[in-house]
């Protein structure tokens, strides 16, 4: 392997270097050689001034924090946001009803008419649902055959996978 020349010859000998020499062609091989056979360079790199500076920066001042006790409030002790939003929605509905009841701009008879129409609509929906559940409409034979054929063709299709 060709060692880079120039600065190396002027400053120090190749064996005395504490930093692995990186050349354009053999940058990785020097590090691998140190890791495989000559452990001197690898150990020097672990004990060099850069490694010491990195270790000192990694140390935290003060004691190492331990596990967080369960009595400390955190994310688990936060209230459920859905429950809070449901509470806000109930309050909003109550405030709206109070506004409508107390507002002189909307006549009371008009409000009662809206409530009566809403009540009739809900009762009609419930009656239609009960009638459908009691006697569901029969599907004709052609629609049943089409549904079965479509389901079978989808199950056998290579696109189903």
Swiss-Prot record:
Q: Which PANTHER family match?
A: EP300-INTERACTING INHIBITOR OF DIFFERENTIATION 2-RELATED, EP300-INTERACTING INHIBITOR OF DIFFERENTIATION 2B
What's in the keyword line of the UniProt record? Developmental protein, Differentiation, Myogenesis, Nucleus, Repressor, Transcription, Transcription regulation
Keyword Transcription regulation on entry = yes
GO molecular function terms noted in the UniProt entry? identical protein binding; transcription corepressor activity
Primary gene name: EID2B
Region (Disordered) residue ranges read 1-26, 54-77
Record's function text = Acts as a repressor of MYOD-dependent transcription, glucocorticoid receptor-dependent transcription, and muscle differentiation.
GO biological-process terms attached to the record: cell differentiation; muscle organ development; negative regulation of DNA-templated transcription; negative regulation of myoblast differentiation
Q: What name does the UniProt record give this protein? A: EP300-interacting inhibitor of differentiation 2B
Q: Which organism is it from?
A: Homo sapiens
Example GO CC term: the record gives: nucleus
